[in-house]
Amino acid sequence: EEILLLTGESRKMSDVEYIGEACKIAKKYFKLIGLEIYPVNSDEYTYLHQCGADYVTVFQETYNTDKYETLHLMGHKRVWPYRFDAQERALRGGMRGVAFSALLGLSDFRKDALASALHVYYLQRK
């Protein structure tokens, strides 16, 4: 009934159109389609939702911005605020649901767990 479509962080290897086509195919066989992909803009989330995606998971990795900067030295993933705002863009793009999490263990797991909960709380209040 449900499937999770997963990509890496490379737009080159799995661009939004490719993911959209995968959603269209999956929609023929599954009731719910989840995505675990790199963060995209609101228009792209709208497109993916129109292709059949229902929800999105984006791992923040860590909410410790100093640690995050040491893990991502270059490229699109380096922009912490863009990743932080991914769930909000997904909801604005029409997704029915979003998921939050840090990769516990990259930094103090207690602080990241609390920050994940506060991230959800923050978005619920917007």
Regions flagged by a language model, labelled:
Residues 98-101, 114-126:
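Oxyanion-binding "anion nests"
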Residues 1-17, 25-90, 96-101, 106:
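Core AdoMet radical
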Residues 16-21, 114-117:
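Charged helix-capping and loop-helix junction motifs
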